[in-house]
Amino acid sequence: MIWLRELSRRLRMLVHRRQFEVDLEEEMRLHLELRQQEQYQSGMTADDARAAARRRFGNPTALREDSRIAWGWEWFEHLAQDVRYGLRMLRKSPGFTAVAVLTLALGIGANTAIFSLIDAILLRTLPVASPHELVLFSDSPEGGTNSGTQTGHWMRFSSENYTYFRGHSENFKELCAFQSSWNHLKIRVAGAAERPDLAYGRLVSGNFFSFLGLTAAAGRLFSPDDDRPGASPAVVLNYAYWTRKFQNDVSIIGKVVEVNGTTFTIIGVAPRTFSDVKYDRPDLWLPLVFQPQVMSTNSYADDPQMYWLSIMARLKPGVTLRQAQAVVSSQLKQILATQAQRETTQQIANSYIELAPGAGGISYLRVTYSEALQILAGIVGIVLLIVCANVANLLLSRSSAREKEISIRLAIGASRSRLIRQLLTESVLLATLGGALGILAARWGVDILASLVTGGTSIVKDSIDARVLLFTACVSILAGILFGLVPALRSSRIDFAAQVNGSARTRLGFGFANGLVACQIAACLVLLVGAGLFLRTLQKLADQELGFDENHILVARINAEAAGYSPAQTPTLYQALIDRIEAIPGVLSATVDYSEPFGGSTWTSNFTIEGLPSRPPGQMKVHKELVGPHYFETEGIPILLGRDIGPQDRPGTPLVTVINQTMARKFFPGVNPIGRRFSLGSPFNDNEAMTIVGVAADARYYSLRDPVPAMEFCAAFQIPDQGSHNSAYAEDVEVRVSGNPRALPTEIRAALAQVSDSLPVTRVTLLKDEVSASLRLNRSAAEVSSAFAGLALFLSCIGVYGTMAYRVSRRTHEIGIRLALGAHRSDVLWLITKECLILVSVGLVIGVPLALASTRIIASQLFGIRATDPLTFATVAILLVLVALAACYVPARRAMRVDPMVALRYE
Amino acid sequence: MLRSYDLHRDEIPPGTLYLLILKTLARSRELHGYEIANSIQRISDGVLEVEEGSLYPALQRMLIKGWVTAKWGTTAGNRHARYYQLTTAGRKQLGVEMSQFERVIGAITRVIEAV
């Protein structure tokens, strides 16, 4: 407390320091005058009296200085002095200042932009109590439900698992569970006549909110009692949904709503800041116990082979993630071993749980972009280093211009440390200006980067916050010290006698400057190689054969569920839509698709072939697609054997399917699969078995990178309400056209509206554009890394030019002598070019191993090309040599034009 | 920071300037710098001669410490002067300095008088 009061007195003093000077001055003057008067009165002459008074008083200047030091603000005044002086120096050389500040702004701005993305996507924590205690049993962003057996990395858990872990939680304070997926809900305020609203709901355990330490914005949140059998059905609203649907009306609390046919009471609203622990935010939360009512299925709680829950836990203090993980993994194996031997020994041995930090919740963005962001952070970090090297080089060549000034300062008694501080202040000032400008650059840079990297979703709101500003300030100051320190140390170590009398011919900073340029070239090589690899990856991916006619297929996204159609009505509706669209001139064929190619969703299952013994489930995996009639004709996928799905495959007919070539090759080697039957799941189920009626050529549905998996395409119309609720409706109508597809969207919309005017059509796009959107991450990697590599190349170019120009100017005298002694102009040209080549070679020698080491990090992002691709390395090396030669051309010409007479007479 | 303690003369034992100022201020309600200097000199019968200017840095330090406060007033001769006044913290500090001084003097005396 005492020091605090002392500090406040000191601060007050800092603010009123003018007054302080005046006060002290007046006080001292009074003293001197009174003493003088006294001496005078005791009989001295006026002059003697003044001298005596001064003698007794001491040296007023020293005393004033001493008093100022007492307040401890001298460093501040020196700093203010340095800043003023620094600003004056910067103003005096506007060209230098502009280049330095602008390049620093680019470097710091790029780092700020990336950091704000990293901050928003990777570092932000959930708005809950002590988020850093939270751990997830899996942070996989995929939502879904598995049934049957699981092995390997466990992402989802059964109700039985959850109960077990809750009962055996030595390492956890508490556990909670929530549904990995979410549910489509039809909601109607009880008694209202209106059509039900569609909403998303997530089932959560009763302690979900208390586990997170949340308090209701209105009403109350769930308690464990709400999640017991026999509890009265209750829902909690998401704040955003409360605002959107009920305009924050508090009187809605206690009202009754009908959710998928069951009446629930709205008991409260979650806090505004909290949207969910998982990125796909539900509109409302419901207790786990109401799963059968909400999903209209059997109870998952009673099925030990239904894996549908995500588990979150709070670590006890002192327990590490690793310790807890080892325990839960061995517990899992124990559970599996003691259960009814559903899994093979091998499956049990391979099963494990990977705990993940839960502070950020389950984020799709984090999982998808964390690697890309880390690579980007590396790239912009290198760019900033190159910028720093450039500015350091500029400072070095400028310090040789300031040698005289500095030697005079040293000669009249400035201490070296004071001088270094002055020079560093100038550098930090430069960096600060660059940083301030960089923040402006980052403000729009963030938007561009965010849209490049993540495809335009406005994930990063209020992105430049205090944390980001702090980061930028630190980066600026560090950069200022980084590029300023060596030049400052060097220029303050000057033989000033030689400087002042003009005879100096120092080779000051040469080795260092060359080293900087070589390092720049090395760093540039790393970035260029990275960019080259990303570009070639993009090209290879874009050149991949898809297997369907993506240039002539239009996709219209429809939602029959929102329009109120029941699953049983859909075949008729869809057939009517198809017939109407096929009547449009220019349309070759139309069909419906339940999940679009490259749409991001997959449905895999194990299966059993009739007449063959069941094989271990891991080996019998097939990707299932639901499709409408004439599907393969519409997609332009050739049928190799048998027939397409047709209009004859209606409800009530025997179930049929078309498999792809990979499935035929893998599971029916050497036999004709037409007419064979298989069923999903195991063992073989005759009632649900499908007959193979055709084999289609392989087409890429899910990924441009991975090989095509085994696929089967079921006739969707045969079982309109089959499978999970979510895929009972077609996602889109696909239309193959003969002419220019871009001319047709309006006609297709009109045709769809004619058949059903209540049917929402969200967008009509070309399939090719959808596929190319799936390359976004690769394209942005190529674009962003190329842009930064280009910037680095440009900066290195300036570096080479600056150094060579400086060397030529320093060697004018020597070149003059050489020419006078009979050297040819071409010898001089070679002299300079040779130096440049040596510089580049050193850079390449440093850069190639660096690049080899760092491209290994990005290897997983590449496709169709090795990280050590010799062609890319060679191209980049040649490019660098050419650019460096171009940069040294101007200085080399200047050297050739040196007039020996002028050069020798100089000085 | 310690520079003010060097009084460049030997007349005042090092480290006692604060003590002298505090004690002087304790005797009267408020004094300005010139009066403090005179008072020290007078009471010590001219034995202790302060380098008068060094009072001022010392007073600044005492202001920071909160031992004294200062305010502007008018002298008998109708001149503008800054008057210093002891605070409670200053009074406490005087006690500390006194006991420290006595301990040191006592020790020195014992050393000198020892046979």
PLM feature spans:
Chain B
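N-terminal helix-turn-helix DNA-binding core of bacterial DNA-binding proteins
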Residues: 11-54
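Beta-hairpin "wing" of winged helix-turn-helix
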Residues: 63-79, 85
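Basic amphipathic alpha-helical segments that dock to polyanions
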Residues: 55-62
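Intrinsically disordered, low-complexity serine/threonine- and proline-rich regulatory segments
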Residues: 1-16, 97
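Amphipathic alpha-helical dimerization/coiled-coil segments
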Residues: 89-115
